[in-house]
């Protein structure tokens, strides 16, 4: 999947939280632009099935009523000069929330006269849609230096080019705190989000990385191992305190950077002492020097196992990162979050391969209103038919504008796309809150959706009991696509359903780990995933006839040429 290519959402918008949609019937009002200036443009609404009757004579000032407002939405008409940033400041109270408008409408620029629907709250914290789910890449750097000085020491010009490309392609470097809220199912992130991390704690971060990150407005987290702090080329505690005041985050990377897995000849007692030193001692130092403990860990070498996980939980870490080269869904297991290491020899194309932001996957089969399977799997991806830019909706055109959303809701429900149909009903009721017919249709649709979700959860639980994890995962994904805030579906996906599809590869003469990675992933650097999955020793040749498990990577389809 092309990660730098601009991806227009396959439906014009996704649904606000199902449980909140009834609020649209209670709080709707129309404001003049004298009270609140109008909003953003996006796609024009579908044309109504019939022309409106002749309009009554507008009352004085009525021609300015171009903003429809409810608890969940603001519907506006774009005026010259409107931008997402300005509209976010005006209607959401924060210009930095412009991403909500851009992601919801699927565009970054607007034209005069277009209808714009602005969500007033995050509408899909899990990022699960009928056609797939959102992924967030986490990148890990080590040392940034004047020039490339080795695989893990990246020259500042190389680093600047990578940051510039992220910025140019519309990526937003979100904070670790926001990302962890996303992985808890409590925070929606921009469609093109990335998390930037820096391991070990090199002092060169201040000279080379910090200025560029500030220039591009990017957040970053430093994972430091405590024995390196204040030693040699490491950052000092005062450096770390200063970086925190500047908006950077600092978390733990163990005490000595030793592998946390138990050694073959290590006794249980010796291992217990060592793991306590590696995991607990840094927490004490954080409290002493930074005024708070770390709550997130980057495993040295990205290596962990079930025994390590138990100790990580014991010492109070809530999230931990590997170096598995893949992006993360919201429901990733929080103690095995993946990161992709960035190397000095990477080309721009290599770098881009680490920025996958969506997993294309039909998460469920839509059903029509009579319960039959929808005729085309592509129906879930179809966008409503749009017409030329609509004229600004003066009050007498309110019914016509609302009717277009009600008509679209009926079409979507017939195709079996219940969540998208609910969304259109809620928007229609934002525009015309007194529409009894739309209110009744919304209530009926909410009941049908709730019934569908309950059935999916029951099916998923039964499949889990039979050990059919892949099929169970599908049911819970569909439930989450219908109800984005369903905690049962989210927590089951995160904690109980961890099946990864894989292919068994039989090693042939001449095969190497990089060549096998190239065969299946189209990327030789994904060899790291094969090594981790199969617990291979580094630099040991593969044996003809050897069986390798090749795991599926979210957002990276198997090549298989």
Stretches with model-predicted labels:
Residues 57, 63-64, 114, 120-194, ...:
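N-terminal pre-catalytic segment of deacetylase/amide-hydrolase enzymes
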Residues 24-26:
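C-terminal motif of bacterial Sec signal peptides marking the signal peptidase cleavage site
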Residues 58-68, 86, 90-131, 427-448, ...:
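Extracellular LysM carbohydrate-binding repeats and other cell-envelope/extracellular binding modules
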Residues 28-30:
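Bacterial signal peptide processing site
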Residues 134-147, 169-172, 182, 190-194, ...:
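Metal-dependent polysaccharide deacetylase catalytic core of the NodB/CE4 family, i.e.
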Residues 63-95, 398, 403-412, 449-450, ...:
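Primarily a LysM-type cell-wall glycan-binding module
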């Amino acid at each position: 999947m092309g990660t730098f290519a601009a991806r227009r959402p396959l439906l014009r918008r996704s649904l606000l939280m199902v449980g909140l949609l009834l609020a649209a019937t209670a709080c709707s009002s129309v404001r003049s632009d004298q009270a609140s200036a109008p909003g953003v443009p996006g796609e024009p609404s579908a044309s109504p099935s019939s022309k409106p009757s002749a309009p009554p004579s507008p009352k004085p000032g009525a021609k300015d009523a171009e903003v429809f407002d409810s608890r969940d939405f603001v519907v506006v008409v774009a005026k010259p000069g409107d931008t997402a940033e300005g509209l976010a400041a005006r209607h959401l109270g924060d210009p930095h929330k412009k991403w909500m408008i851009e992601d919801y409408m699927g565009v970054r620029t607007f034209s005069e006269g277009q209808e714009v629907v602005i969500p007033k709250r995050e509408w899909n914290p899990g990022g699960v849609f009928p056609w797939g789910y959102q992924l967030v890449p986490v990148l890990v750097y080590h040392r940034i230096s004047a020039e490339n000085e080795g695989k893990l020491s990246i020259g500042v010009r190389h680093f600047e080019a990578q940051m510039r490309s992220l910025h140019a392609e519309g990526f937003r470097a979100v904070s670790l705190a926001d990302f962890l809220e996303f992985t808890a199912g409590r925070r929606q992130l921009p469609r093109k989000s990335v998390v930037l991390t820096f391991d070990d704690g090199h002092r060169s971060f201040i000279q080379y990385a910090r200025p560029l990150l500030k220039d591009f407005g990017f957040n970053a987290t430093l994972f430091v191992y405590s024995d390196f702090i204040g030693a040699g080329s490491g950052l000092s505690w005062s450096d770390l305190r200063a970086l925190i005041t500047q908006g950077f985050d600092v978390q733990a990377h163990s005490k000595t950077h030793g592998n946390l897995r138990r050694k073959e000849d290590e006794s249980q007692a010796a291992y217990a002492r060592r793991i306590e030193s590696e995991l607990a001692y840094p927490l004490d130092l954080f409290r002493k020097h930074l005024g708070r403990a770390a709550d997130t860990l980057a495993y040295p070498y990205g290596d962990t196992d079930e025994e390590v996980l138990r100790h990580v939980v014991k010492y109070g870490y809530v999230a931990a990162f590997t170096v598995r080269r893949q992006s993360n869904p919201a429901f990733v297991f929080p103690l095995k979050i993946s990161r992709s290491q960035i190397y000095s020899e990477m080309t721009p194309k290599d770098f881009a391969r680490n920025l996958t932001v969506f997993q294309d996957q039909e998460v469920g089969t839509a059903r029509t209103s009579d319960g039959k399977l929808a005729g085309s799997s592509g129906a879930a991806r179809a966008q409503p038919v749009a017409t030329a830019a609509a004229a600004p909706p003066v009050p007498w055109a309110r019914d016509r504008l609302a009717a277009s959303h009600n008509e679209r809701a009926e079409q979507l429900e017939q195709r079996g796309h219940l969540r998208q149909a609910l969304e259109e009903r809620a928007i229609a009721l934002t525009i015309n809150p007194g529409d009894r017919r739309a209110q009744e249709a919304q209530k009926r649709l909410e009941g049908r959706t709730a019934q569908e979700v309950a059935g999916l959860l029951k099916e998923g639980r039964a499949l889990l009991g039979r050990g059919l994890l892949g099929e169970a995962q599908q049911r819970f994904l569909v439930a989450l696509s219908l109800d984005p805030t369903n905690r049962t579906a989210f927590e089951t996906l995160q904690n109980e359903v961890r099946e990864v599809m894989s292919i068994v590869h039989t090693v042939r003469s001449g095969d190497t780990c990089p060549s096998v990675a190239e065969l299946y992933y189209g990327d030789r650097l994904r060899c790291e995933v094969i090594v981790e999955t199969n617990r291979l020793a580094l630099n040991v040749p593969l044996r003809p006839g050897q069986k390798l498990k090749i795991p599926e990577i979210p957002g990276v389809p198997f090549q298989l040429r």
